[in-house]
């Protein structure tokens, strides 16, 4: 019996019997894409915005999460009267291929019809595979062209892949706090997290569900390690400094009293294992590591966008050391080389990579302004 800390719950899904051919050469004979929508699709089906989530996100972008009860992960940006205005636009967000919130992934049953899940045997996927699965959903919804595709971090990678693979299907693209490839440093951090999962005694070679356990300790450490990269030193100092949980530190047993930042990271790890699957973490982090748009186009990033009519807004954050501003500037130069319509804005913030998820007024004004201008150019009322 599966003793996963989070139950299998019903999600809104679209099923595709024709499956999906993956970049690795494997064909998924059965594909399900879990998704949520907000707002109304207009009669012309021209007001759709696709939101692409990051590594540990899901489709519940603007509503309480069904497992945790927490507000939608991008409530700051998406909703009625917000920069991505659900009173004006039809907003779609899908759980990525390989995820664990309803879309086909390691928790899904194998193609041959057995009740056992894919688990660690789920095939390797790419960010482009994720986008092709999303395109099936968009086609199924009857939408010929998306007004915009918006996403941050890994979501931004998906935005870039959409604009490269299906330029005629995307009027505007907003890749945020992202890059056209995953750096060696980012791959290294991911590998530390993966090794923490692999070496957890409850991992069982990736078949932990058949043993009724999960590699909770390893997954928690992976989350803790990753979470450090999402913050800046200034943000950590402001929030925690060197504050101890209690003042009389040396009176505590063994190693003394813990620092507040330690407790914070432990909370991040322990709460994460209640809503995320370890095998999905392995699959998705590897997909991010494989992402390299230039390598896919003969080493030329500009070639990935040659002939595009999509208009772009690139956004970076000054204190983001996971996806630094230099990488967004490189994307802007590549787009300029093919005469693409591109704007680039660096938001000054000391909140690190996660600033794109937080209350950043300059960022919100930037996105709202771009979407308003793009809507006017697209003839949207």
Swiss-Prot record:
Highest taxon in the source lineage: Bacteria
Top EC group: transferase
Binding-site positions, substrate: 223, 354
The keyword Amino-acid biosynthesis is annotated on this UniProt entry: yes
UniProt keyword annotations, A-Z: Acyltransferase, Amino-acid biosynthesis, Cytoplasm, Methionine biosynthesis, Transferase
This protein's GO CC annotations: cytoplasm
InterPro entries from the UniProt entry: AB_hydrolase_1 (IPR000073), AB_hydrolase_fold (IPR029058), HAT_MetX-like (IPR008220)
Localisation per UniProt entry: Cytoplasm
Assembly: Homodimer.
Family stated for the protein in its record: Belongs to the AB hydrolase superfamily. MetX family.
Classification via NCBIfam families: homoserO_Ac_trn, PRK00175.1
HAMAP family assigned: MetX_acyltransf
Protein name: Homoserine O-acetyltransferase
């Amino acid at each position: 019996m599966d003793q996963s800390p989070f139950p299998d719950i019903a999600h809104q899904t679209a099923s595709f019997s024709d499956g999906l051919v993956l970049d690795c050469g494997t064909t998924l004979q059965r594909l399900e894409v879990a998704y949520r929508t907000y707002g109304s699709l207009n009669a012309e089906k021209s007001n759709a915005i696709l939101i692409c989530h990051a590594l540990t996100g899901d489709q519940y972008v603007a509503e309480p999460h069904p497992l945790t009860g927490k507000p939608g992960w991008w409530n700051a940006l998406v909703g009625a009267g917000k920069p991505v205005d659900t009173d004006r636009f039809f907003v779609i967000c899908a759980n990525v291929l390989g995820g664990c919130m309803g879309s086909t992934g390691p928790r899904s049953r194998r193609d041959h019809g057995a009740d056992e899940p894919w688990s660690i045997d789920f095939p390797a996927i790419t960010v482009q595979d994720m986008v092709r699965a999303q395109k099936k959903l968009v086609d199924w919804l009857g939408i010929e062209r998306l007004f915009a595709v918006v996403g941050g971090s890994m979501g931004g990678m998906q935005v870039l892949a959409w604009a490269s693979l299906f330029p005629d299907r995307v009027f505007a693209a907003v890749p945020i706090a992202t890059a056209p490839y995953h750096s060696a440093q980012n791959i290294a951090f991911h590998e530390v997290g993966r090794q923490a999962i692999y070496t957890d005694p409850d991992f069982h070679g990736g078949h932990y569900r058949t043993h009724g356990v999960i590699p909770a300790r390893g997954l928690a450490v992976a989350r803790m390690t990753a979470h450090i990269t999402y913050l800046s030193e200034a943000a950590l100092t402001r929030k925690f400094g060197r504050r101890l949980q209690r003042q009389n530190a040396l009176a505590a047993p063994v190693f003394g009293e813990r620092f507040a930042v330690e407790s914070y990271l432990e909370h991040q790890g322990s709460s994460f294992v209640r809503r995320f699957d370890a095998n999905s973490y392995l699959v998705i982090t590897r997909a991010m590591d494989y992402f390299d748009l230039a390598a896919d186009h003969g080493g030329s990033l500009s070639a990935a966008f040659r002939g595009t009519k999509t208009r772009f807004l690139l956004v970076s954050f000054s204190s983001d050391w996971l996806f630094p501003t230099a990488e967004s500037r490189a994307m802007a130069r590549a787009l300029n080389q093919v005469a693409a319509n591109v704007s680039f804005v660096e938001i000054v913030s000391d909140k690190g990579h996660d600033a794109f998820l937080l209350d950043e007024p300059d960022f919100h004004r930037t996105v709202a302004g771009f979407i308003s201008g793009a809507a006017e150019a697209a003839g949207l009322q």
